[in-house]
Design a protein with these regions (language model features):
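Hydrophobic alpha-helical segments of secondary membrane carriers
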Residues: 61-65, 126, 221-222
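Short, well-ordered loop/turn elements at secondary-structure boundaries
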Residues: 108, 128-129, 136
Length: 260
């Protein structure tokens, strides 16, 4: 997301802001119905509502979507960040591409072992701890970035951000932007509803809550935290654009900002 902000500006924040809306849908509409029926997984719900064939088809679609759309992005971004911070390629004297592939494999294996050995409880505890660290650490990145932009002054950094290349702050995407404003309120809402309200990896955490109220609190708290994503993920991309306009790849915006 920081890389997209580096290239296209603030309009990409729509992906995160609309996620908060669909998390409210999860808390108020979907979760009560899931728990009322005693559903343990989303495929269980679909089998009860339709038939076993539907469940098998949806299971297959979920697996393909996770393997093709979600996991590659997570593993690639994690590998890119780790390689930029710890210079794995240089340390092992291998190419940049080989270092990324190595880290992708190691991250994937670590995730599998963690999920299998620790189970859902360990994942929930780790998510809570990681969430606190990500919010605190994530907010520090734009703060230090603005100080660097202002040559030691936070306020001068804000002034430069709002006056130099101010067009980057336009959050209303045009027809040629990656996220046009019309798409943010039509197709993107549907995509985010699918992800946040039916994705097994997301919903399973709320289904494992002690009660409906606790699950709703978790979903609504997540919605609040998603509203911070423009500051944590999008703003660093804009800051990186001001500081490093000659990056070979936009995806390097966030790791370069953190590393420097």
């Amino acid at each position: 997301l920081s890389g997209q902000a580096y290239k296209s500006g603030m309009s990409v924040m729509g992906r995160e802001v609309t996620s908060a809306v669909t998390l409210i849908f999860l808390a108020l509409i979907f979760l009560p119905r899931y728990l009322k029926r005693g559903i343990a997984t989303i495929p269980d719900f679909l089998e009860e509502r339709y038939d076993k064939t539907t469940r098998i088809i949806i299971d297959f679609c979920f697996l393909i979507a996770t393997g093709v759309c979600f996991l590659p992005i997570v593993l690639y971004s994690g590998a890119l960040a780790l390689n930029s911070l710890f210079h794995v390629g240089e340390s092992l004297q291998i190419s940049h591409g080989a270092a990324i592939w190595l880290l992708v494999i190691l991250l994937g294996l670590a995730g599998i072992l963690y999920a299998v050995i620790g189970g859902l409880r360990a994942m929930a505890v780790a998510d809570s701890i990681n969430g606190i660290g990500l919010v605190i650490g994530g907010l520090m990145v734009p703060v230090f970035g603005l100080i660097a932009m202002g040559k030691g002054s936070f306020m001068q950094g804000i002034e430069q951000l709002t006056t130099v290349h101010a067009e980057k702050l336009n959050s209303i995407g045009g027809p040629t932007d990656p996220l046009p404003i019309g798409a943010a309120f039509t197709g993107l809402i549907l995509v985010n509803t699918f992800y946040w309200c039916t994705n097994q990896g997301i919903v399973q955490r709320t289904l494992a809550s002690k009660s409906l109220a606790e699950g709703q609190k978790g979903a609504l708290l997540t919605a609040v935290l998603k509203m911070l994503d423009p500051l944590v993920l999008v703003l660093p991309g804009l800051i990186a654009f001001h500081l490093y306009q000659d990056l070979p790849k936009a995806d390097m915006a966030y790791p370069t900002l953190v590393n420097n």
